[in-house]
Design a protein with these regions (language model features):
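Phosphate/dinucleotide-binding and metal-coordinating scaffold of catalytic cores
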Residues: 2-8, 16-293
Length: 293
């Protein structure tokens, strides 16, 4: 694409405006008429250097940004309670660092970084570090707290097939989602939790990235999707206190449920010197998923 002084000026103006602008904003910035700005945008749009987003009065022009390993446009799928995936929307990373999100229900928004509906999905806590350990090819560092929004989006788009909630980000993650039933952790009974705890402490257990610092793992038992916190296997006072706290958490949740308040269904298991607090996941069904915010 050959550039004219005006097309160059349009690109400069878009960069100065954070990678996104309306036609009126470009006209004001360039002191040019609407037809003149439209003519300058035409070759940029044809080449894909500039993208047009939104509709009618909310239409804007954006400078797309390519994220290595992710691309310049990221589809987002939503998994229903039966395990079927359907389009939720798309994400367009912008040169100014923001992300333009378009949902299939018509919502179109500019976000300064990662959209709010993805925040609870980001790998974090104990299982976030397990996620990072499991995927060294991401080359993002061992602690997800230090990841940038681009890093998080890359992790989601490449390996986010089993994250909390019901969204799957990116084509690669969607392809992994379709093979997840064959890879997901499953056990015959809670008696197998001791081995899963050992695997989790070694950072080798497949499973989704639930937040929090308490050691935990996700698995399926008796057809139920569960998240399981576990204590150390030692005999010190600290180890015993951790076991007691897990029992207290179980009793507290039972008390809430007895009072008619929403609470996770939990069970306590003692296996191989450890105490396990098993909680049924509220973002999973037998076959599919449930959204969460």
């Amino acid at each position: 694409m050959s550039s004219s002084p005006l097309t160059t000026a349009v690109l400069t103006a878009l960069r100065a405006l954070g990678g996104i602008a309306t036609s009126a904003e470009l006209q004001l910035r360039l002191k040019a008429s609407q037809p003149t700005v439209s003519r300058a945008l035409a070759p940029l749009l044809q080449a894909g250097t500039v993208r047009k987003v939104g509709a009618a009065r909310s239409q804007r022009y954006v400078l797309p940004r390519h994220i290595p390993g992710v691309g310049g446009e990221v589809p987002v799928m939503r998994v229903d309670t039966q395990g079927q995936a359907s389009p939720f929307g798309r994400l367009l990373p912008l040169q100014g660092g923001g992300i333009w999100a378009e949902e299939t229900d018509g919502v179109r928004e500019l976000h300064d970084g990662l959209p709010w509906f993805l925040n609870d999905m980001r790998p974090q806590g104990f299982m976030g570090r397990t996620f990072a350990h499991k995927h060294p090819e991401l080359q993002l560092g061992a602690d997800p707290r230090h990841w940038s929004d681009d890093d998080v989006l890359k992790a989601m788009a490449l390996f986010g097939d089993d994250l909390p909630g019901n969204l799957v980000v990116g084509e690669a993650a969607l392809q992994r989602f379709h093979t997840l039933p064959a890879r997901a952790s499953k056990v015959a009974s809670p008696a197998d939790y001791a081995e899963l705890a050992e695997q989790a402490m070694r950072g080798t257990l497949p499973g989704s990235s639930a937040g929090g610092e308490q050691p935990k793992f996700c698995t399926q038992v008796d057809g139920r999707h569960v998240i399981v916190k576990f204590s150390p296997a030692g005999t010190s006072h600290v180890d015993q206190r951790t076991r007691d706290l897990l029992v207290c958490e179980h009793l507290a949740l039972q008390t809430l449920a007895a009072a008619g308040l929403p609470a996770a269904r939990t069970r306590i298991h003692a296996v191989a010197g450890r105490t396990f607090l098993e909680a049924e996941r509220f973002d999973r069904t037998a076959l599919g998923r449930i959204g969460m915010v």
